[in-house]
């Protein structure tokens, strides 16, 4: 990088134009006295400055109550007094910021150290109190056995009470510390939100600048933009100068705000370092230091001494190469290169800014290009080239703001994850405190019972001594019958073996009955479904009958109403008929009177009257006949209605009886179905219990399989040792050949030289011939032994391969079928096992044995890994392996020998040669009856496994040159070791609790391995797994996963046959997500993310992404 010197004439212009503007912007109360040609300070910048000052005060108060207002006032006074000079304001501001940062960091350390001292002092006081109580209570102990027991009880109670008080005080201190930490983290989150608001404000100002300059975002690159800018500058030179002045003003304001953001970020980072969290885990410290030294290679000693305060504070608070070092280097480079004004300097600085920055502080620490563009931009604008400089500065600012926003999101994501972990830790702490209190109470109870038992023990001891003295006085002999005891032990052992045999037979029966139970369960579910359908149909039919009854009742009511109406009509007609009868009688009387009058009086008048009466009579008769007919009709209708009502009532009674019978039948059917459903439910619960037991058996089979694999590895090691012995014997044969040739040459030399001494020559010849015969015999014996060993080795290999291919293939198929049948119930058993802490049963011991056997990697490292096997002793599932991989994996699997095949070969050791005896000895380092022995015996014999196998290997290597008798003696002792050998180390309660914790939270072990929070540990694991993949840069759980390539790379490390990573493209997001999710679902990892939403959003929800990545880690790594 070339650096050119700037002209001396540019220095007063910088001091006259750019620096007074910065001073005026740092003092918003004097903004009215701005020089001519410079616009007054915007209210947004003043508000941002006041906000950052308030943030500084807040951080200073949080760090330890240090008053920082004096430093701020000093900063204001230095800025206002240094208006004529150019370098002075920048240096005073940087010094004041460094002082503030050192003050806050030192005050934070003082506060934390004071808190630690207070907590330690309270603990010492509590201990002294408990000691004083004990010392006060001890002298009051009287003599005698009862007094001694009382003293023991009082001591145990006081110790238990002291422990309870200590635990309570510790828990209270931890809760208060957690609350303080949560409050501080909440304050940090509020500050992060204010930073987001300030970044948005800066982006709005950048858009305003682009709008003022006339720069369109669609034409930010290319020759069209430069041509448009040149035409605008050519036509409007005065406007360009004014806009450039505004741009310089805004650049200085942005620079000040960025400096204050740097200071705040540094203080936040010190606070997080003090709290125990680190933001510099994405890059190595040496790489960051090297990268930033390349940005500022020329640093003078004077400037280094100016930034000494910052460097010392960074050494106290963080590692080398951290934010403080980089900030000090940045300020030094800015002070050192203020006198250079070439275009090469501008281009080089902009190219440095465009370099990729991954840390949360890199974007803030990159050297700002706007600082070197004050006065040269004015000169270039007068010369016609200022447009390019402004465009470059705008692009640099855009890039830096984008990087700041990305880092801010990562920081907020990490803070949210930290808050969640703090809440979880607080809950765990409360649970542990309650558990600690409960254990303290139990400890007090146990101490009391221990004191009682010790008193009883002393009492019984005195009684035993008394009885022994009585026996000695009366000369009565007493002997402990060891034979009876050993017989009792043998009887218990035999009963135990019988129980183990019965358990094995029951397990086999359960495995055989499992398919039948599953079929029965399916049939029961189908019957239950049919019964439910029948119940629904019967209910529908009963509803239909009830509706018919209601309609019939309505018809009956209507008929009754009609009958009442007809009865009323008949009654009215009867009344009318009676009235007419009375009228008829009256008329008859009148007629009689008229006849009498006619007989006595005038006949003409009588004729008229008779005529009129006759007419009335006819009318009355017609009316009576019509009324008679109406009455007959109404009576007929009434009779017909009564008949109809009677029929309807008969039908209603019959229908009601039929409905009652049907309802009774339905109730009986419903009761039967309910009883059947209850029976089915009980059968289902029994089947679930049997399924759980079968799952336990499957886990035991897994343990046996792991044991077999470890023994196979030991056999392979033994074969390697035999091959080494074979090579050693071949070397011995070669040395014997060479020695034979040398001796024959010497013999010929002796024969040539000593022909004169015939007797001596004959003696020497006879001796040489005897030696040659001996050597030939030894050579022949060694060759026969070698051929015999090679034949036996080939026979062993062939038998092992032939037997294992059939047995292990059938065994693996049976286990895979069992696992496929029980896969649906695995989730329920895991939830039930993790929901509550069970008592130590066979199931929990088997699970702890299984999980503990995966911890040591020393035994698993003996098996050679293939390129397609992701981890040793772990076969990928059937869905995750391609056909070619299955073919390549079936070879190593076929070499594993089941337990029964190896246990059958434990025969007579005296009839075997040495090497085969060694092979059998190593093969017997496994208990032959392991499938028949429950998990309790396997847990007892676990502890001596590694030690016994290593001692046996050392004995074998030490006895290579020994005689066959010593090897036979070692062979007789090796089965005794093999009875107690096992592939895993002893399972202690602490390891059990850690395994249980890792099953509940799989990220706890990862956090212990990598350090820091669980989120950062998972992020480091993802970075480690995706090392070497192109276009992968994982720095968070949101934007780093938005194209799907990170998921594909992570799953490609485990499932290379499912993901063609070389064919993937970052633009085709939907295809990437589809491939990754399908590959994960093929092995049983359910997708919790939506493909369309992931492909649509640029920043997905980091919590959902982290949950999905945790599921991948849990499946493949735990």
From Swiss-Prot:
GO MF annotation: an example: beta-catenin binding
Main localisation: cytoplasm
Protein's name according to its UniProt entry: Cytospin-A
Biological source species: Mus musculus (Mouse)
Chain intervals for the UniProt region annotation (Disordered): 1-63, 75-176, 294-324, 359-391, 921-999
Family: Belongs to the cytospin-A family.
Biased composition (Low complexity): 80-90, 359-373, 972-992
Modified residues (Phosphoserine): 385-386, 390, 869, 882, 888
One of the GO BP terms on file: cell migration
SUPFAM superfamilies: Calponin-homology domain, CH-domain
Residue spans of biased composition, Polar residues class: 93-117, 133-145, 294-304
């Amino acid at each position: 990088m070339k650096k050119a010197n700037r002209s001396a004439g540019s220095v007063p212009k910088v001091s006259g134009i750019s620096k007074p503007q910065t001073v005026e912007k740092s003092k918003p109360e004097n903004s009215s006295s701005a020089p001519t040609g410079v616009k007054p300070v915007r209210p947004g910048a003043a508000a941002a400055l006041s906000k950052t000052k308030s943030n500084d005060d807040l951080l200073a108060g949080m760090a330890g109550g240090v008053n920082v207002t004096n430093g701020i006032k000093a900063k204001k006074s230095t800025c206002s007094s240094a208006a004529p000079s150019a370098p002075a304001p920048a240096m005073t501001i940087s010094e004041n910021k460094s002082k503030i940062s050192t003050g806050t960091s030192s005050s934070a350390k003082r506060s934390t150290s004071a808190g630690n001292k207070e907590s330690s002092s309270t603990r010492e006081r509590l201990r002294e109190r408990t000691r004083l109580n004990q010392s006060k209570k001890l002298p009051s102990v009287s003599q005698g056995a009862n007094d001694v027991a009382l003293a023991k009880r009082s001591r145990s109670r006081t110790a238990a009470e002291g422990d309870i008080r200590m635990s309570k005080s510790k828990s209270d201190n931890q809760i208060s510390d957690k609350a303080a930490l949560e409050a501080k983290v909440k304050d940090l989150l509020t500050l992060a939100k204010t930073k987001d608001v300030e970044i948005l404000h800066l982006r709005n100002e950048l858009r305003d600048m682009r709008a003022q300059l006339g720069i369109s975002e669609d034409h930010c690159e290319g020759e069209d933009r430069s041509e448009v800018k040149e035409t605008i500058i050519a036509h409007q030179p005065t406007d360009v100068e004014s806009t450039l002045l505004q741009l310089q003003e805004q650049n200085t304001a942005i620079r000040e705000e960025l400096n204050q953001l740097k200071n705040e970020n540094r203080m936040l980072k010190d606070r997080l370092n003090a709290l125990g969290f680190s933001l510099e885990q994405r890059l190595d410290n040496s790489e960051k230091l090297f990268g930033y030294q390349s940005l500022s290679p020329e640093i003078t000693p004077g400037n280094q001494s100016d930034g000494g305060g910052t460097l010392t504070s960074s050494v106290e608070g963080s590692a080398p190469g951290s934010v403080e070092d980089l900030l000090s280097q940045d300020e030094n480079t800015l002070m050192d290169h203020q006198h250079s004004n070439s275009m090469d300097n501008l281009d080089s600085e902009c190219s440095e800014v465009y370099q990729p920055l991954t840390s949360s502080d890199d974007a803030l620490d990159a050297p700002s290009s706007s600082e070197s563009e004050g006065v040269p931009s004015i000169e270039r604008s007068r010369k016609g080239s200022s447009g390019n400089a402004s465009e470059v500065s705008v692009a640099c600012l855009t890039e830096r703001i984008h990087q700041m926003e990305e880092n801010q999101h990562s920081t907020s994501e990490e803070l949210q994850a930290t808050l969640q972990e703090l809440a979880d830790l607080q809950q765990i702490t409360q649970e542990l405190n309650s558990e600690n209190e409960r254990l303290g109470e139990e400890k007090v109870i146990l101490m009391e019972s221990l004191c009682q038992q010790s008193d009883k023990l002393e009492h019984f001891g005195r009684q035993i001594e008394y009885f022994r003295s009585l026996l000695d006085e009366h000369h009565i002999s007493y002997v402990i019958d060891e034979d009876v005891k050993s017989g009792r032990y043998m009887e218990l052992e035999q009963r135990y073996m019988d129980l183990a045999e019965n358990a094995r037979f029951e397990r086999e029966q359960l495995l055989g009955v499992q398919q039948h139970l599953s079929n029965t369960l399916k049939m029961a579910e189908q019957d239950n479904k049919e019964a439910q359908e029948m119940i629904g149909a019967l209910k529908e039919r009963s509803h239909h009958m009830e509706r018919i009854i209601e309609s019939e009742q309505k018809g009956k009511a209507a008929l009754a109403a009609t009958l009442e109406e007809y009865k009323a009509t008949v009654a009215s007609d009867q009344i009318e008929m009676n009235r007419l009868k009375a009228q008829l009688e009256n008329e008859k009387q009148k007629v009689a009177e008229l006849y009498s009058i006619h007989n006595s009086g005038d006949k003409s008048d009588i004729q008229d009257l008779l005529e009129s009466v006759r007419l009335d009579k006819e009318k009355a008769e017609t009316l009576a006949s019509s009324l008679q007919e109406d009455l007959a009709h109404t009576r007929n209708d009434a009779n017909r209605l009564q008949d109809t009502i009677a029929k309807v009532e008969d039908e209603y009674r019959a229908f009601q009886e039929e409905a009652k019978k049907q309802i009774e039948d339905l109730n009986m059917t419903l009761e039967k179905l309910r009883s059947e459903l209850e029976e089915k439910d009980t059968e289902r619960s029994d089947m679930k219990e049997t399924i759980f037991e079968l799952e336990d058996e499957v886990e035991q089979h897994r343990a046996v399989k792991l044991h077999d694999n470890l023994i196979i590895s030991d056999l392979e090691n033994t074969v390697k040792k035999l091959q080494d012995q074979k090579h050693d014997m071949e070397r011995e044969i070669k040395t014997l050949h060479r020695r034979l040739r040398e001796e024959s040459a010497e013999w010929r030399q002796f024969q040539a030289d000593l022909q004169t001494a015939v007797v001596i020559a004959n003696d020497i010849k006879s001796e040489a011939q005897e030696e040659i015969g001996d050597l030939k015999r030894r050579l022949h014996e060694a060759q026969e032994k070698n051929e015999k060993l090679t034949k036996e080795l080939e026979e062993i290999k062939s038998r092992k391969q032939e037997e294992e291919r059939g047995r292990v293939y059938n065994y693996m198929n049976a286990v895979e079928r069992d696992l496929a049948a029980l896969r649906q119930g695995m989730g329920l058993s895991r939830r039930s096992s993790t929901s509550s802490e069970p008592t130590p049963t066979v199931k929990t011991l088997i699970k702890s044995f299984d999980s503990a056997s995966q911890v040591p990697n020393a035994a698993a490292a003996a098996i050679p890994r293939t390129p397609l096997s992701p981890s040793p002793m772990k076969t990928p599932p059937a869905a995750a392996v391609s056909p070619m991989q299955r073919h390549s994996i079936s070879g190593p699997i076929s070499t594993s020998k089941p337990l029964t095949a190896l246990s059958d070969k434990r025969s007579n050791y005296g009839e075997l040669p040495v090497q085969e005896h060694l092979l059998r000895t190593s093969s017997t380092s496994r208990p032959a009856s392991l499938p028949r022995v429950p998990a309790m015996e396997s847990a007892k014999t676990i502890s001596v496994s590694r030690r016994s196998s290593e001692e046996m290997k050392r004995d074998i290597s030490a006895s290579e040159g020994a005689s066959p008798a010593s090897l036979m003696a070692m062979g007789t002792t090796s089965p005794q070791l093999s009875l107690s050998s096992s592939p895993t180390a002893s399972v202690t309660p602490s390891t059990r609790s850690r395994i249980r914790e890792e099953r509940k939270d799989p990220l706890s072990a990862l956090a212990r391995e990598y350090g820091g929070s669980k989120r950062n540990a998972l992020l480091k694991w993802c970075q480690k797994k995706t090392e070497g993949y192109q276009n992968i840069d994982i720095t968070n759980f949101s934007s780093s996963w938005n194209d799907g390539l990170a998921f594909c790379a992570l799953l490609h490390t485990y499932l290379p046959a499912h993901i063609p990573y070389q064919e993937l493209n970052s633009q085709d997001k939907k295809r990437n997500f589809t491939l990754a999710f399908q590959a994960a679902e093929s092995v049983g990892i359910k997708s919790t993310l939506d493909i369309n939403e992931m492909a649509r959003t640029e920043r997905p929800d980091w919590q959902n992404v982290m949950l999905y990545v945790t599921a991948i880690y849990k499946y493949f790594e735990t």
